[in-house]
Amino acid sequence: MTELRYAVRALFRNPGLTLAAILCLALGIGANTAIYSVVNAVVLRPLPFKDPERLARIYTEFPTYGSSGGFHKFWMSTPELLDLRRLTNSWTSLEAYTISGVNLSGGAEPVRVTAASITGGMLPMLGVAPQLGRLLGPDDDRYGAPLTLVLSDGLWRRAFGGAPGVIGRELKINGLAATVIGIMPRGFAFPPGETDPPELWYPQQINPNNPGGRSNHFQSVIGKLKPGITIQRAQAEFGQIMAEQGRNRTPHFHSFDPKFHTLLALPYHGEVVGSVKTAMLVMLGAVAFVLLIACVNVGNLLLARAESRHHEIAVRKAVGASMWHLARQCLIEGFVLALSGAALGLAVAWGALRLILAFNQGSIPRAEEIGIHWSVLAFTAGASFLTGIFFGLAPLAQFAGDSQESLKTATGRSTATRGAHSLRRLMVVSELALALILLVGAGLMVRTFWKLQQVNIGLDPARVITMRLALPQAQYTQLPAVKQLWTRLLERVNALPGVQSAAVLSGLPPLRPLNANDIQIEGYVKKPGGPDQNVDYDQAVSPGYFEMLHIPMVEGRAFDARDGASSNDVAIINLTMARAFYGNQSPIGRRIREDRDTPWCTIVGVAADVKNGGIDKPTGTEIYFPYSQVNGGIRALYIAVKTSGDPQRIVSAVRRRVAELDPSLPIAQVRLMEDVIAAANARPRFLTVLLALFSFVAVSLAAVGIYGVMAFLVAQRTREFGIRMAIGAEPADVLALVLAQGMRMGLTGVAFGAFGAFILTRFIRQLLFAVQSFDPLTFLSTAAILTLVIAAACYIPARRATRVDPMIALRYE
């Protein structure tokens, strides 16, 4: 205990240096722990299901079909799922789910929630257990069985106050009676990785005699491999199935085929986290650099402290202190320093993790599993301990010999050795190089985000608010009643004070699920290499939609009042579709239809492109229909309202108008159109902000490091500067001398950093948009920024050197 008290006193004889070392360690440990906790939960940790390594995501693909180079990782139709269950022997089970929004009533008030309809074996296959009640099983999934459902912990607590009595209670889902049979445990998320995760699960209850059309692809399929079966073996079996069906191929397009309609099985974990894996590993590399810079800074500080203690250690050794006693004291000081940094680092990690999760906005899958992971805290703390111990023992290196000789050496005014100076300079060069690598990475992401912001979405989102409304089929069985409600609602909303215009639409740009619907184009003959008759996106809208969002018509006209249910069917296509199927010819007056059972529609307009598959993706083909002429798919639509003032103020009035028509209908997903567009950029914005933050920390630490070294060197050369000025040197000469020394060190770090960035930035190439990994503007601007920081950090001690009084310096010596 006495040695511990002495260690604390010794450390705080120079409180500024000690606090700086603790802060450096805390920043490095805290940032590293926070990001590794995210990476560990999202990427490294297995999925929280039974035997997760045996789970696989199964897709169908159409490699040669469509107008955009084929459809990859596509959904499966229900008949295809039933076929696959019958034909394959590699899987213990093949289950499916579909995500949608549902109206849930029976609680305090109707709510719109995200739900997953699942096949009966899904939850048992995952090996999860409910916290209350039971799971959905095969009996619940039997066609015609009473409808049952399972609630998430969050929905149970939010809508029902966490009351156990909800088990057995009858609710209504989309107007159909359903009994609550179970509550899932807190933190359960299925499917994992969804931006808007389901809070309710109910059985699909597939009709075995009428499972739907083979071309109706909407099922997401997950399989569990039999023990001992690899995914490669299962894929090989898929190849046999495709080859057999391909040999017996019928004119029906949707038979499995090794060329036209393939099957693909991939590990489920990789499919859940694959979209963010690179970004997460980049973040882990970034914080590792921050930790390295922090440790280098601590090493520099402790080396400076070691040189200031030469005399103390030499005296103690001369009066009989053993090397073991001195080493033990230095070890204790190192442990105190590292423990303090680790403790503060834990607080930094906790705060950083809270900020990351708050700023997440759906950018990180499996966010519900993220928390402080103690193994990485132990690792980073251990690394810091080793750093502190190594440099804490550094003062003893020069005193391993004779005590009297050590004392003579230590009593000199200039105790720093050439080796110590070289090591210190090497450390500064290293941390500056690491800082520039981080700065370049952040600069590339800033450029990417800026480029994304400059992309023309194709519409004007100003003062537009959107909301989702769904009409349950159990209540609205007839399509004319559905269309009538939408028409009456639009009339009432358009009549509200402050509303400039209102419209309904089936899909919300700029990021929508792919439709990939077959179409028929009158007179179209496919040329070699030409597109198939298929459209990527379809959109049901009301008259006034194009005008409200300022979507220009390239040719023809927009929908208007003449395009009603009793009028001739019409359509509008986007410019991409016009070019794909009509080339340089005008499509106005040509006819098109979705399938053989629907009437022909006359194309009356060509609209400018609106982003539909993501801001960073090429615009897909798109066809618009008036909602009043559509025969299905319009029970759930978005309402878009453009106002003359703050759009948020109109929401309550719209709710009242909906309640006047049907009080059982909840409005959901109320968002400004500007926020919808911003959400499409959420992931690059998230990565940009974090990289910018880490690069700022890294540059700050590097600036502190070079400032500390230059200040120490100036202090060591006080006599030299005094003599120079005593014999006629001007202050400007001394200033230039010190700045030149610091800038040589700094520019060496910049050069090594630029080389390192050139090598490493290629690993973030897939995260960039419209920016090359070696972007000259980014490299030059970040190098210039770091050079200015270096110059500023060197100027302060250089300026101090010019103020040395020659007489005081000579008298000191």
Please name every model-derived segment.
Residues 294-338, 415, 704-743, 750, ...:
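Interfacial "coupling" helices/loops that link adjacent transmembrane helices in transporter permeases
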Residues 14-42, 46, 293-295, 342, ...:
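Short, strongly hydrophobic transmembrane alpha-helices
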Residues 47-101, 217-222, 456-518:
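Membrane-proximal extracellular/periplasmic loop immediately following the first transmembrane helix
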Residues 35-63, 88-90, 129, 194-195, ...:
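Membrane-proximal juxtamembrane linkers immediately C-terminal to transmembrane helices
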Residues 1-18, 268-273, 301-328, 332, ...:
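Alpha-helical transmembrane segments of integral membrane proteins
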Residues 115-138, 147-281, 354, 441, ...:
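Mid-to-C-terminal secondary-structure elements
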Residues 1-17, 101, 109-112, 144, ...:
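Membrane-helix entry/capping segments
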Residues 38, 299, 335-406, 444-448, ...:
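Small-residue-rich transmembrane alpha-helices
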